[in-house]
Amino acid sequence: MMKIKITKSTILLIISFLFILAIMAYIGLDKIIKVLINTNPEYVILAFILQILVSVILSARWKFIIKILGYSANFKNIFLLVLMGLFINNITPSMRGGGEAFRAYYLSKLEEIPKGLAFSTVVVERVLDTAIFLFFTLFVIGYFVVTGFKYLEYLILSWIFLFSLTAIIIYLIANKGLLIKTVTKISKFICKYCSYNYDETKILQSIEEFYNSMKFFKNKRGWEVVVAIFLSVMRYIFDILKLWLLFLSLSYVVSVICVSAVYLITLLSGVLSITPSGFGTADTVMILSFSAFNIPPSVAAAVTLLDRLVSYILPTILGYIAMLIIKREIDKKKGK
């Protein structure tokens, strides 16, 4: 008989799914279905196009950052790597946090870019995204401090956690000796339990490449930083517009400010989530947050389900296909 391996992530995913079903049942499945039946598919398609455009923007930003370092990378490969990164983010605990290392690793394989340099590009991306996100969410938290929100303490805790994590990473980068000690200890631990060969020379070489590229970033001109920030902000704007379009698909008019606030709250709530892509936690917070803005629970639940389709299910499928293509390309390179 074939044995089925059940992981902790699978169990958590099932529990989260059942929890969402319970919330849907409490709101009224018949009410939610009634709202979904009247969905305008044209707006959903537009939302999906925006989702693809977000990936294009992320790819353009990454290519720009790589170009700053004096390297050239094929846009198709970068786009596939971004899709693969989204796939990995969607199947790992918390939100938007698991795919960067894989993207950097496969970038070095596909484009023959030094590993340390490849990792520095995704670190710069992460710092940009996190800084902009923390800045925006600080205003949202301030708004809810004044107006009141049931889960305000949870949001503040998530913000502090993300800020602290970012500060620790920046502190490690600023202290080369400490970073080397940390990376070597983690590498030894991983190699011990994952049957990888520990090569300290390669690790130290990658760290040196990483620092050389970070120095290069530090000396860049202002306009190049502005372009990178602009593309990062555009990514968030497109994400918010995508969610707003899903309301229009249900013929429900809602302010962009409301959608922006809930979008940021939902991302923030997923920081402390232990389920893949914040599944369950983020959905619950999204429904409750929209309800706090006096949006009918049935509409809030319907939009949440549509958002999962557009922002989670379809990108996960595309990301998996992208990962298969990337692995095939790498196998071809090995065969040459």
Curated annotation (Swiss-Prot):
Record has Cell membrane as a keyword: yes
Membrane-spanning segments: 9-29, 40-60, 68-88, 127-147, 154-174, 223-243, 245-265, 285-305, 306-326
Record's GO cellular component terms: plasma membrane
A Pfam family assignment: LPG_synthase_TM
Domain of life of the organism encoding this protein: Archaea
Location(s), subcellular: Cell membrane
Entry similarity comment: Belongs to the UPF0104 family.
Protein name as catalogued: UPF0104 membrane protein MJ1595
Species of the source: Methanocaldococcus jannaschii (strain ATCC 43067 / DSM 2661 / JAL-1 / JCM 10045 / NBRC 100440)
Lineage: Archaea, Methanobacteriati, Methanobacteriota, Methanomada group, Methanococci
